[in-house]
Amino acid sequence: MLTLDTLNTMLAVSEEGMVEEMILALLASPQLVIFFEKFPRLKNAVTADLTRWREALRSRLKDARVPPELTEEVMCYQQSQLLSTPQFIVQLPQILALLHRLHSPYAAQAKQLTESNSTFTPALHTLFLQRWRLSLVVQATTLNQQLLEEEREQLLSDVQERMTLSGQLEPTLAENDNAAGRLWDMSAGQLKRGDYQLIVKYGEFLAAQPELMQLAEQLGRSREAKSVPKKDAPMETFRTLVREPATVPEQVDGIQQGDDILRLLPPELATLGITELEYEFYRRLVEKQLLTYRLHGEAWREKVTERPVVHQDVDEQPRGPFIVCVDTSGSMGGFNEQCAKAFCLALMRVALADNRRCFIMLFSTDVVRYELSGPEGIEQAIRFLSQRFRGGTDIASCFRAIIERMQGREWFDADAVVISDFIAQRLPDDVVSKVGELQRLHQHRFHAVAMSAHGKPGIMRIFNHIWRFDTGMRSRLLRRWRR
């Protein structure tokens, strides 16, 4: 069967103009105009999607099939073009019958042309074919427009769904134009209103806890250098030149007080010969207050020292991915659970704004993984927020999963974030050693977000940074009072 793309080529019908006209009509629709006014950040994201829309429309036109009736009429037209005028006159009754049978829009006009002219001349033959071609072009154009209209309705429906989703999540997740673009890309999934309302709910909770949002931004955009802890830092040799007096005097450099008899000034020696001043001379000698010549030489020598190496490679805007481990034990339930989930949502916001990856791992007895910054990030975030914190605590498995993840090339500059109350068993020595190696050799940073003031110091000692957000009733009341 003939395709629409082939038909357009045969009849020299250009679909580019129709595609552009349809895109402009879509952008001028009231729904999009109102949406762009309300969410200006998403306008650039939608505009960047125009190329994909054009390609989708061209592909739809290219693959569309022409109706059998129109295909048969086009084939008859092509064959008629090859006939001479006498041959065409012989075939004319069959052509008129075919047009009538196919209910062609040109059937009535073709019959009128034939009946109104008793003699079928070559000029009439040319006119007949020209008008027939014009009728076919009109039919092809109408078919293109019908398909584009169907696609426009479908595209507008999809865009409206994505606009609704993006508009709901924009205040929570879109901090800048880059985040708005990634949010728009992620909105292409099949989501229902009830699904993403969970993100809206935790976004409202996060807005009610500004200290939690501020903590996430400080952690995500920390400008501190990646430093190696001093107790584990390797020693390096440093060589410096030191200036010091030589052992052999070279020249008179001035006068000083002292007890060097060989370098006494003549007036001091004169007092020794006066009986009344002799005791005064000895007193000043004992107290090293006699005036003497200062004879100095100079020398330079190389001084070799060893000291711990502290790396100060300042990473003003870290761009590595986040590996976030969330404790889902029973002690992290209730308000702790809400804060942990909202904090992860805040890190997702930072990751989208800075074009970073955000990888979530839940640890209790098993490790569950979610990628919040991928193409299906919204769906993954909904699944994560739907989890319940009712398991045990196996923080060692969490660290082993982090260590394993950091071995990959794409995670070489990742920052690890562990969210817990840190009320757990001590870490095995091999885990502590491996974490120290990652910090020392690869400058990976390990952050702790402590949800309790009673975390075990032995566990928290291995972290580069400890960010405290006490969820106790007293701390919650103090935070509310300070707002």
Swiss-Prot record:
Primary localization class, coarse: cytoplasm
Subcellular location: Cytoplasm
Cellular component terms per the entry's GO annotation: cytosol
Record keywords, A-Z: Chaperone, Cytoplasm
SUPFAM superfamilies attached to this UniProt entry: vWA-like
UniProt keyword annotation of Chaperone present: yes
Biological function: Component of the RavA-ViaA chaperone complex, which may act on the membrane to optimize the function of some of the respiratory chains. ViaA stimulates the ATPase activity of RavA.
Homology family: Belongs to the ViaA family.
Subunit structure: Homodimer. Interacts with RavA.
Protein name: Regulatory protein ViaA
Gene (name only): viaA
